[in-house]
């Protein structure tokens, strides 16, 4: 029986990857939708907490605290990291140790007691400073996650529209350890959401297993269109005038994106995509340089179009051949593994 599943993978660095695979009857995997993701991970929650501190103490105090007491600053965020991973959203308050030096520095630089400024701040009713600690209302602590979790839910919801009959959503990675993030995902997507016992180490274990059994993924979906920059005969009714180039009496159009693979195309791992023949534009060359480009668009016209970027250059030695114009370079792109391979025959 085939099963379709999303794998939602988050990293401590602040990014998230979402992939969709179908488990085939032989146990191998087929990619159903190209990997997607964005800048929504645990680091974004840390930044929300930092902005929260700025609202209380002001930008100058936080900057000076980091400069003068870097060890205390880092320890504060290390403590926050532990609380972030354990937070489930069920308690009324979140309480943890808070550096007294920050309170002293605020009073020294601002000349007022912190309690007065707290009450005058936008978040004054949500926090207290009892005996070397900080107490934050659960509703405020949830707000640190809100933007990031909402982005994740929106991304997964959009993917669900493209992939019907989904069986499971698997959460792995450091940010997936958060009970609050897990509960929000279950609240939105129901019982199809689950995570392994150790979501952080699962990523490493998966990488090791894939290294040993790299053929387990039998089909992938291309995230980009891939092609070769080329020149072709200029046709004024079709081509941009600024791309017109004359060589040895022949008129060409330059920078054409000659597509080998289209974004969203399903390709078997190790499959040779149909190749194309390329000819040097002039004789007397000792080398030919193939420019490999990628684009987020399905059918880009020129390699200079928005969304196109250079993947790599391939230099071909032409010295053994005398008549270059009549000696074609047949180029194939091998797609499907963790690397893109360009073969020239």
Task: Indicate where each model-derived feature is located.
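Conserved phosphate-binding/catalytic loops in two-lobed NTP-binding clefts
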Residues: 183-208
């Amino acid at each position: 029986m085939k099963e379709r599943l999303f794998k939602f993978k988050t990293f401590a660095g602040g990014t998230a990857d979402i992939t969709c695979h179908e488990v085939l009857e032989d146990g191998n995997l087929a990619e159903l939708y190209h990997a997607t993701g964005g800048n929504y991970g645990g680091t974004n929650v840390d930044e929300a907490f930092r902005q929260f501190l700025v609202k209380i103490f002001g930008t100058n105090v936080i900057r000076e605290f980091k400069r003068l007491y870097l060890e205390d600053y880092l320890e504060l965020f290390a403590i926050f990291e532990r609380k972030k991973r354990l937070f489930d959203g069920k308690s009324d308050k979140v309480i943890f140790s808070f550096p007294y030096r920050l309170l002293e520095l605020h009073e020294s630089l601002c000349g007022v007691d912190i309690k007065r400024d707290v009450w005058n701040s936008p978040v004054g009713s949500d926090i207290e400073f009892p005996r070397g600690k900080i107490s934050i209302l659960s509703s405020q602590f949830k707000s640190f996650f809100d933007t990031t979790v909402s982005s994740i839910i929106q991304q997964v919801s959009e993917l669900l529209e493209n992939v019907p009959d989904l069986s499971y959503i698997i959460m792995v990675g450091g940010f997936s350890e958060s009970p609050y993030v897990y509960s929000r995902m279950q609240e939105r997507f129901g019982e199809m959401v689950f995570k392994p016992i150790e979501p952080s180490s699962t990523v490493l274990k998966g990488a090791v297993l894939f290294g040993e059994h790299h053929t387990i993924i039998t089909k992938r979906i291309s995230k980009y269109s891939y092609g070769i920059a080329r020149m072709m005969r200029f046709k004024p009714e079709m081509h941009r005038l600024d791309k017109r180039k004359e060589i040895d009496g022949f008129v060409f159009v330059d920078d054409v994106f000659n597509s080998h693979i289209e974004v969203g195309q399903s390709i078997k791992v190790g499959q040779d995509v149909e190749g194309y023949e390329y000819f040097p534009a002039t004789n007397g060359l000792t080398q030919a340089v193939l420019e490999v480009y990628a684009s987020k668009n399905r059918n880009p016209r020129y390699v200079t179009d928005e969304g196109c970027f250079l993947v790599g250059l391939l230099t071909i030695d032409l010295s053994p051949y005398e008549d270059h114009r009549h000696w074609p370079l047949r180029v194939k792109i091998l797609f499907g593994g963790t690397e893109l391979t360009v073969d020239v025959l």
